[in-house]
Design a protein with these regions (language model features):
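SAM-dependent methyltransferase catalytic region
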Residues: 1-179, 185-189, 198, 202-214
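C-terminal substrate-recognition regions of SAM-dependent nucleic acid methyltransferases
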Residues: 102, 186-425
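Charge-rich, low-complexity amphipathic helices
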Residues: 163-164, 171, 193-194, 393-397, ...
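Short, amphipathic C-terminal "tail helix"
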Residues: 427-439
Length: 439
């Protein structure tokens, strides 16, 4: 339907340029055919898509329709980019006689989002995983050097990840990206489509450089803010309303929790290490993963610890190195996010494996427990969520989580008051995050 919508828009513009008395049926047909012939050029992924495009624009009439398909479109875009661009820019490819070079005013579309690829073996069967491909369409569209590019694509590029890190960096630093309309819930855009992480569409303008107008769409309401997409480096803050919260916290806080968080693999113990069940004098307790949301303990010698031995006898607070539910990409926003697994205390004489990230170290249990409870509050987890770029958690995800006084306990209400959050900002945090309990 995109070719039809574009053609109709051009057709209406042609009609507007004519006197109303001229617009009889013959003239209208002439204007429509001219728009199809002169203004619309379609790249299709399959022969069927090409045939549907022809029928949509011309019906059963024998008129020229500029529609082509590539036998191996995705491979061409991924591995033969220059060849693809050169072919599309050749007038002969489109059978345009007397034209020296093809120049496209705009490239628009709703490209395919992903393809299934072999990802190794799983119990003797080929493992399948979804690889993003929409990014290739955006990149090739820019290479055609049109005046404008506008496409609707999954919003998961905000977080980077496999196949998207370079694309994200390019998009965030592209000053020609002048408008970004964001749908955290895909059903706010396509009512019958549920896409984890939501959707977005954008406007790229070749001859215009400016900050980007970011528009958050939520249940029919919109919030717009003109800002630099790379305001925080390679971290894209999706919510416009979160910007003011970040700035309030940065203005008030003296330091941030990222200073407390250890590097991944605190003690140099691989996830696969399993200790022994019987305690031997001098042993320490190892906490290791036992599948999703589960852990087990065993005993190991202190010699197994190859890093940070001085932290063994501290009180530690640990979380999983993974964001729950594969990055919570499929979580419906209205149900709320957790941002991290439930934090647990790791006592002196205990260590954990690579599966866990230690986010705080303390000399006494009271401060360790107060910090653990603090991290279960909604505001710290909300601040973590604004930084996510993958399903893995690391030090960098705590750069906006303020360090507090842990000789006392904290509640969200106290945190909201301390940082001076407005009612609207509080509502955003409360509606985004789900409560976290120990159960």
């Amino acid at each position: 339907l995109y070719p039809l919508y574009v053609t109709y828009s051009i057709f209406r513009s042609r009609c507007a340029a004519c006197c109303e008395e001229e617009l009889d049926d013959a003239k209208l047909q002439q204007l429509w055919d001219a728009a199809v012939r002169e203004n619309v050029f379609v790249i299709c992924k399959t022969p069927m898509a090409k045939q549907i495009t022809r029928r949509t624009l011309a019906g059963y009439r024998d008129i020229p329709v500029n529609a082509h398909y590539f036998d191996d479109l995705i491979n061409m875009m991924k591995n033969k980019t220059r060849q693809f661009v050169d072919r599309v820019l050749k007038p002969s490819y489109w059978k345009q006689e007397g034209v020296k070079a093809m120049k496209f005013d705009a490239v628009v579309g709703n490209p395919p989002y992903q393809s299934m690829t072999n990802g190794g073996s799983d119990s003797g069967r080929a493992a399948r995983q979804a690889a993003p491909i929409f990014n290739y369409f955006v990149e090739q569209a820019k290479m055609l050097e049109p005046g404008y590019v506008s496409m609707i694509i999954p919003a998961r590029w905000y977080n980077g990840g496999i196949g998207l890190n370079a694309f994200r960096a390019d998009m965030l630093n592209d000053k020609h990206l002048t408008k970004l309309v964001d749908f955290a819930n895909s059903k706010d855009c396509f009512t019958t489509v549920d896409i984890g992480g939501g959707l977005c569409y954008f406007l790229w303008e070749r001859d215009h450089e400016d900050e980007c107008l970011v528009i958050n769409m939520n249940s029919g309401e919109q919030d717009a803010l003109r800002r630099s997409l790379n305001q925080y480096g390679n971290l894209f803050i999706r919510s416009n309303k979160a910007i003011s919260i970040i700035e309030k916290i940065r203005a008030k806080a003296d330091s941030f929790v990222d200073e407390m968080v250890s590097a991944i693999d605190t003690f140099g113990i691989p996830s696969k290490v399993r200790g022994h069940e019987e305690y031997t004098e001098g042993d320490i307790l190892l906490v290791h993963s036992d599948g999703a949301n589960s852990s087990k303990t065993s005993y190991i010698s202190r010699d197994v610890v190859t890093k940070n031995a001085h932290l063994i006898d501290k009180y530690k607070v640990r979380i999983s190195i993974l964001v729950p539910q594969n990055g919570e990409a499929g979580v419906k926003p209205e149900k709320g996010y957790r941002s991290m697994s439930t934090p647990h205390l790791v006592y002196p004489g205990q260590v954990d494996s690579f599966s866990y990230l230690n986010i705080g170290f303390f000399d006494n249990e009271t401060e360790a427990e107060n910090f653990r409870k603090y991290m279960m509050c909604k505001l710290p987890r909300f601040m973590m969520r604004t930084t996510y770029s993958s399903a893995h958690i690391s030090q960098s995800n705590f750069i906006f989580v303020p360090k507090m006084d842990y000789t006392r306990s904290w509640t969200d209400s106290e945190l909201y008051e301390y940082f001076g959050l407005s009612d609207e900002e509080i509502k955003l945090v409360e509606s985004t995050m789900r409560p976290m309990t120990d159960s």
